[in-house]
């Protein structure tokens, strides 16, 4: 069920043939998951933390994953751990390399780094599918940032701001958010400016929307709603592009060169050809929108 859910959404659906998928059976002592005490009987030491957080034994998860991939291959492997619970929860753990080679930082490069996405069965198939899209496909595979925020968080912290620009941007991660503490990005300076200038994307609801990475100030996102904000609405164009790029980078290696026009040609199946019935004629350049439900942002570690 999880595998079919992963390939139910573009661009994963169109490029399913480029993926290898393995299932490793792991049986816990007792059924289900609960608070911290459940770590004692869960095969991966999994338990619920605060909000929607899930904590697990990453080292043990990786040891099970190495039954089907090598330790070296883990750098490019997304590991999904599905927990038997109807409770709505999910957390993705991302690792970035401590030593990075600046010579690899070219336009097509997509930084390596293992990922473990923990989430529950969520109680129904549609919620499960959307959770998988956000945690596993968005964070874990495409290295996308969260597009939701909480009003109480205020301005993005200096630590998170510089983590983005020093650690993540050189790896081409978080392509769907634009942190900027001083002023507001314009249609010419925002990270996805080329989509805003492309008339083929005029009906995709793209703009400069305020709020992201859990902060209402200092971070901007490309659409009001998407899988990376509210677990619905599909992946927006910058996110689809990031997914497309990482699929091809992993499938064809460093000799693969990204071509924007080839992406746009593929992406015709996802673009809207006419305005939606609820679209306003004049959308403000900066739009606010707070998250409706508590989420847990990805946990990033430098290894």
Segment roles from a protein language model:
Residues 1-151:
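Active-site-proximal segment of zinc-dependent metalloprotease catalytic domains
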């Amino acid at each position: 069920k999880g595998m079919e859910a992963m390939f139910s959404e573009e661009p994963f659906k169109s490029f399913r043939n480029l993926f290898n998928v393995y299932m490793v059976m792991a049986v816990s002592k007792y059924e289900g998951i609960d608070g911290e005490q459940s770590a004692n009987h869960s095969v991966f030491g999994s338990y619920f933390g605060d909000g929607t957080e899930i904590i697990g034994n990453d080292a043990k998860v990786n040891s099970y994953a190495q039954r089907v991939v090598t330790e070296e291959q883990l750098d490019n492997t997304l590991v999904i751990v599905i927990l038997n619970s109807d409770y709505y929860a999910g957390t993705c753990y991302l690792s970035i390399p401590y030593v990075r080679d600046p010579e690899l930082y070219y336009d097509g490069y997509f930084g390596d780094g293992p990922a473990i996405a923990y989430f529950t069965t969520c109680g129904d198939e549609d919620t499960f599918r959307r959770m998988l899209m956000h945690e596993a496909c968005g964070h874990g595979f495409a290295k996308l940032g969260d597009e939701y925020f909480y009003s109480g968080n205020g301005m993005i912290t200096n630590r998170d701001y510089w983590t983005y620009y020093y650690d993540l941007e050189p790896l081409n991660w978080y392509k769907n958010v634009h942190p900027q503490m001083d002023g507001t990005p314009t249609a010419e300076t925002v990270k996805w400016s080329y989509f805003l200038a492309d008339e083929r994307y005029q009906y995709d609801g793209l703009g400069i929307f305020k709020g992201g990475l859990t902060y209402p100030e200092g971070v901007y996102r490309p659409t009001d709603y998407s899988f990376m904000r509210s677990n619905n609405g599909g992946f927006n164009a910058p996110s689809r592009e990031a997914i497309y790029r990482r699929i091809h980078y992993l499938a064809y290696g460093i000799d693969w060169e990204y071509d924007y026009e080839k992406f746009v040609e593929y992406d015709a199946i996802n673009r809207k050809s006419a305005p939606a019935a609820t679209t306003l004629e004049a959308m403000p350049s900066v739009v606010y929108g707070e998250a409706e439900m508590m989420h847990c942002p990805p946990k990033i570690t430098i290894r």
